[in-house]
Amino acid sequence: MSLGPLKFQAVGEKGEEDEEESLDSLKALTAKLQLQTRRPSYLEWTARVQSRAWYRAQARPEPVGPGAICGFDSMDSALEWLRRELQEMRAQDRQLAGQLLRLRARLHRLKVDQVCHLHQELLDEAELEMELESGTGLPLAPPLRHLGLTRMNISARRFTLC
């Protein structure tokens, strides 16, 4: 009775099966959510390359330019296309980074506003309770200092985006 070849792995090392499983689950999730995993320009390029009749070109030898590569007329045109794509990607990256920073600043502002609002509500409730307990109906001069509650002094200089 033979056991077959044994495979040993270091602790924490992923096997090929785990990687294939995670890749398969990622592909399934992408298909389920109907996400596009390729840039439109890449899809255009593949369509451009696949639209050429490679078999017909091989069957009938036409004088093809000496620099024709992968659907481009020359290496220079391929490099120019690549440069344009990289510039577009850079511009998109800058746009997304700016949008992310604006969202982060807005989120931070909303959090500070919420904390200020909650603190003000806490002070108002506690002050009302103290007025009802004392029965005088007059607001207290130092609001609830003996309970450890003070008004918050929130200034924009105390908070940063980092």
From Swiss-Prot:
InterPro entries: FAM167 (IPR024280), FAM167_domain (IPR051771). It holds the Pfam family FAM167. PANTHER family: PROTEIN FAM167A, PROTEIN FAM167B. Belongs to the FAM167 (SEC) family. This is Protein FAM167B. It comes from Mus musculus (Mouse).
